């Protein structure tokens, strides 16, 4: 039996009014990939911040042991010196610097008072080769994909002689190719005796990669098990504290009249002159959930941002809303016609991160909270309270900045913003991306509730089980065209993928 490289015992961490960690025990063996799972708010990030010295010794109760020796980190530097490296979802690379400069940032290779550039580049090449990355160390990081930037972070950790590498949602922004590369590297590191703590909501990756899984819930350790003793459903049940008999709580309903009709619709990109949407026709009914599936680059987002007036391109074709022909050129016009659009990138397009929940949730419906063209703060608070309560938002206060919320709660704020405007047509682009299974379930219930109230919903998703589990009808796109249409009972993953790859 391999010895423990890390033991955290009785870790308790409190913030004003909140016990984030409650007597947590977490032990990791040398040379294993150890998954740390839990819903947003379960305590995963807090525990890792305790381990990495972000929360210094004295700010928490409990003890930490590295290779059997108690450690008391007062800052991040001390944890790094002990062999701990943490790679966050938001990468800490400097894009204007070269790969080599990033690798040795903070521990530069010196010759006297000056950087030894020849040695720096040759050492960088060595570490890049160690993780199988064939790139010039003099390349500017800005020219690399997000996946390769993440691998640079791993190489940087290894260059500091890291014994334990913590990866926080490492595949959230990666392409399938980059994910495959990362998986291979993690397996290689495991064979070299490097320990990886793997935090991810993607349980299929956990099942594939991890040796051991620890589940946290509400700041407590629920279980630690070998992966071969668990199923994905059992992990979910431990995370949420209940059995999820159906991951996708579909509710049959009667759909109403046609509220959106698109006929022979094409879009030409203004910059490239390329036709990104080709002769598309479809309809949406009140109370219907219309799933949109397709591979990356299939044109799903371009189609619906164009219909919403948010895509810069020349349009051909006809659009009707409630039987009336419309020509929407700006999002403001789409909103007037009762449309709402939840973007796939909530942080960039859906929220003002440094503003509070109240202001974010009323952004689209300012007319509802103004008197004589002046915002009535009391009315704004009242409206925000009502809509966020309906969304079951979890936050310490509505005056908290949305940047401080979990991914699931941020998405609820985005939904609140649009629902305050009472839309007839709600377009959801990757609505559950980057949120945990418990929060996903809550989002699905909200979607069902809205559909039962007669809202027509477009559900764009890269997750086939999500599209199949939630939709009444599914359209498949490939290269800007609709290549397949299925009723709920007809759809299979094989049929959808055949259409998504251009087959029939």
Swiss-Prot record:
CDD domains xref list: ABC_Carb_Monos_I, ABC_Carb_Monos_II
Superkingdom of the organism of origin: Bacteria
InterPro entries attached to this UniProt entry: AAA+_ATPase, ABC_carbohydrate_import_ATPase, ABC_transporter-like_ATP-bd, ABC_transporter-like_CS, P-loop_NTPase
UniProt keyword list: ATP-binding, Cell membrane, Membrane, Nucleotide-binding, Repeat, Sugar transport, Translocase, Transport
PROSITE patterns xref list: ABC_TRANSPORTER_1, ABC_TRANSPORTER_2, XYLG
Enzyme Commission code(s) on record: 7.5.2.10
Gene Ontology MF terms: ABC-type D-xylose transporter activity; ATP binding; ATP hydrolysis activity
Membrane topology category: Peripheral membrane protein
Domain ABC transporter stretches: 6-243, 260-504
Location(s) in or outside the cell: Cell membrane
Annotated positions binding ATP: 38-45
Reaction(s) catalysed by this chain's protein: D-xylose(out) + ATP + H2O = D-xylose(in) + ADP + phosphate + H(+)
Example of a GO cellular component annotation carried by this entry: plasma membrane
Role description: Part of the ABC transporter complex XylFGH involved in xylose import. Responsible for energy coupling to the transport system.
Family indicated by similarity: Belongs to the ABC transporter superfamily. Xylose importer (TC 3.A.1.2.4) family.
Record text on subunit structure and interactions: The complex is composed of two ATP-binding proteins (XylG), two transmembrane proteins (XylH) and a solute-binding protein (XylF).
Protein name: Xylose import ATP-binding protein XylG
Species this protein is from: Geobacillus kaustophilus (strain HTA426)
